[in-house]
Curated annotation (Swiss-Prot):
Keywords on record: Activator, DNA-binding, Transcription, Transcription regulation
Pfam families in the cross-refs: HTH_8
Gene Ontology terms, MF aspect: DNA-binding transcription factor activity; sequence-specific DNA binding
The keyword Signal is annotated on this UniProt entry: no
Reported function: Activates ribosomal RNA transcription. Plays a direct role in upstream activation of rRNA promoters.
Protein name per the record: DNA-binding protein Fis
Oligomer status and interactors: Homodimer.
Chain residues forming the annotated DNA-binding region: 77-96
Gene3D superfamilies (UniProt xref): Homeodomain-like
Amino acid sequence: MFDQTTHTEVHQLTVGKIETASGAIKPQLLRDAVKRAVTNFFAQMDGQEAEEVYEMVLSEVEAPLLDIIMQHTRGNQTRAANMLGINRGTLRKKLKKYGMN
């Protein structure tokens, strides 16, 4: 669903490399990237009905996010869970879901 540009934007936002003039990361950048990707997805559907879009979008964002966070923490699940704001058990379930365990 997402093109390589969107994956790159997610990566840069996750590791904090996109900054504004004030040096602050703007969540709006990620929102805009997701909006562009979903808009492109529907444009490619060419009028066909889409199903389970919510779950698809979540998995398309969640999988690379988890991958990047795990790389950033060098596989430390406790640190990764803290960064994500979830408990370690939830992180382990999500990693298993995407085959990252």
